């Protein structure tokens, strides 16, 4: 976000970078034009121009939900050419990230202002770099460390009992996240991952794995791609399950939010979880909003970010993660504006 973000009383030619078939692109175009602005210039991730586009400002959107682009990014990031990646498969996460960072660098080289700066998007896409930035700024986070790069090494150093989250360094929407607890006699890993034909796939439901053989199968494939090991913070529990909150921070202020509730450790709504009633949560929500604003302030060149905030049983709040593309919040209204309209108006200064 730059000083060029104030364009009152003049048309602004927006460049939308993303997967052009995605509803994110379609919906933001609609909101932008509804404010009297010209039709955005669409810029496909799979066909980035070498020369600088003739636009005033860029909105860089998610690279997800496109297998063809994923294959291209994996190759660009040092992975195999035409990787045999199926829809929903969890593989080549590191290579995908490196490839996406290479595209972001090409976009940065255009020298154009952007809603969210390319270099900050890259950091938000890296859970360890984000964690370090938060800790340096004094923003509350669960204790975390880089996980070992192999299951054997992880097994050698684990205690006799424990309760942790293992999260891929590069991922979003709960992809590859594992909630793991164990004692001397029992163990359980919960994750949206499914094992199909010797490969890992995201599913729309949280699965449970209760043998070390199953757990090893999963972690032996994820740990070498990079994971962060995070203390499991027991979430605030209500009658219908535990809750956390996704907060959309726009121009420094907490705006749209959704309280997410689940009986499993993962609260992502696409996993069959529900939006919870926020009645009686005024104090923890206010604390969550202030913490989300502190987290977003660590990325001073980004107009907006989705921030997941954990609420514990004692009223304490922690940053779960930050998402440069966490603004897809259909149906949520703040001050009579949906999320995309609020972002557009914040940039235009209206």
Where are these regions (language model features)?
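Nucleotide-activated donor-dependent transferases that construct or modify glycoconjugates
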Residues: 10-19
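A short beta-strand motif that forms the metal-chelation/ATP-contact edge
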Residues: 14, 57, 179, 246-249, ...
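Short, flexible loop/turn elements at secondary-structure junctions
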Residues: 18-21, 47, 170, 233, ...
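Conserved N-proximal alpha/beta basic substrate-recognition cap immediately N-terminal to
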Residues: 19-31, 35-148
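Short catalytic/ligand-binding loop motif for oxyanion handling, primarily in non-cytosolic enzymes
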Residues: 24, 123, 173-176, 329
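Phosphate-binding site of ATP-dependent enzymes
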Residues: 32, 159-268
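Rossmann-like NAD(P)H-binding beta-loop-alpha module
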Residues: 140-163
